[in-house]
């Protein structure tokens, strides 16, 4: 190269491959308030040191590639690169480590969950040097939080819209989830709402199929909730699923729901995508619609303990993207959810400020500043005998959703709804009187059956139903110490 054509990029350039840890492993780094912090569970391939594995994650999810390139000299890598600033072994696991990575805020587009995830959990999860990789938690700095609008309305505004205070809200997913005509579907909604539920719900895969087109379903469900409102004097809602094959069709359904005057719509945020979800959340905010979020497909991402992404990260992403409700597991029902871990991400959904607490799986202190909270939805295999535990675990700011636990009542849908409402009111009253729901729950339900034949019938049907399986998502403990105990 002649002196006339030599550039700054060529000065000191050495072609070839060098270890990631030489550039991206910086244990002396002091994190900034504006950094996005990530905790990865890293399982390196045999022979790969944990420092190299952690540095590889930082590199491949930020500025790095597999070899030194000329254009590195045209920017400031020290300003833009991700940094692995800490590594610790996972208790009780061989060859697993928690790698802490800090990302400069300038790496991310403002207000875009899509861009954030494309960087942090993009190609790096297919990296050959890693046997497995899981994103356990993120710390979102307040500077980045403030670029998001978050939930369309939030918990307090929803309560004000519905005029419902001092108790969890009650819902029901209409079953069978597929196959009903629009008219029969609307009839089931009406019966449940008339019986005392606050909401009924489309299931996640109810979109616009040949047996029930979306417009017909919207019309019959709107008729059902208005009729139930007139009879009960309470505000009712049905989660009209606006999820569609295109964003244009999704928005068309949301617009039609608004024109019908219903209070709430629904979206499958993982299958629909974060870009679509954020767009729908903006529309709901501008047009007074609440937004219920279903997490269909989440277990594909978060079920395995050593690979994928923990649901607490997906929950944080949803709070930023926008949603007023999200399914969060039940702890006591048929779906996955260990108590302390579930309550950890429930707090991340609802509270303004959450302290680091590894006993609940929370790796970082999170400050949401003024971002509204999200109501957790407990749904899946729950019935009246679970009501005391659900009320005690989730508290008032939650939605308890009984599908089969309403529609499976031997006397029909409306009596099933009555049973759930009576059980909830009994638990709330007992709690307010100072009784312990955890120890006296069954007694409280039995007492309530004396003045509610609907509840008595429900208790008889489901008295033997239990879902007792070991949770997959558990806290890390030292297995050798556990054995000694």
From Swiss-Prot:
Pfam families, per database record: RuBisCO_large (PF00016), RuBisCO_large_N (PF02788)
Catalytic residues as annotated in Swiss-Prot or TrEMBL: 175 (proton acceptor), 294 (proton acceptor)
Site (Transition state stabilizer): 334
Propeptide regions on this chain: 1-2
Span of the signal peptide: none
Modification N6,N6,N6-trimethyllysine occurs at: 14
Chain positions recorded as substrate binding sites: 123, 173, 177, 295, 327, 379
Keywords (A to Z) from UniProt: Acetylation, Calvin cycle, Carbon dioxide fixation, Chloroplast, Disulfide bond, Lyase, Magnesium, Metal-binding, Methylation, Monooxygenase, Oxidoreductase, Photorespiration, Photosynthesis, Plastid
Cofactor requirement: Mg(2+)
UniProt-annotated binding residues for Mg(2+): 201, 203-204
EC numbers: 4.1.1.39
InterPro entries named among the record's database cross-references: RuBisCO (IPR033966), RuBisCo_large_chain_AS (IPR020878), RuBisCO_lsu_C (IPR000685), RuBisCO_lsu_C_sf (IPR036376), RuBisCO_lsu_fd_N (IPR017443), RuBisCO_lsu_N_sf (IPR036422), RuBisCO_lsuI (IPR020888)
GO MF, any single term: magnesium ion binding
Note accompanying the cofactor annotation: Binds 1 Mg(2+) ion per subunit.
Subcellular location: Plastid, Chloroplast
Modified residues (N6-carboxylysine): 201
Catalyzed reactions: 2 (2R)-3-phosphoglycerate + 2 H(+) = D-ribulose 1,5-bisphosphate + CO2 + H2O; D-ribulose 1,5-bisphosphate + O2 = 2-phosphoglycolate + (2R)-3-phosphoglycerate + 2 H(+)
NCBIfam families per the UniProt record, alphabetical: PRK04208.1
Subunit structure: Heterohexadecamer of 8 large chains and 8 small chains; disulfide-linked. The disulfide link is formed within the large subunit homodimers.
Record family assignment: Belongs to the RuBisCO large chain family. Type I subfamily.
HAMAP family reported in the protein's UniProt record: RuBisCO_L_type1
Miscellaneous comment in the UniProt entry for this protein: The basic functional RuBisCO is composed of a large chain homodimer in a 'head-to-tail' conformation. In form I RuBisCO this homodimer is arranged in a barrel-like tetramer with the small subunits forming a tetrameric 'cap' on each end of the 'barrel'.
Name listed for the protein in its UniProt record: Ribulose bisphosphate carboxylase large chain
Species of origin: Bartlettina sordida
Organismal lineage: Eukaryota, Viridiplantae, Streptophyta, Embryophyta, Tracheophyta
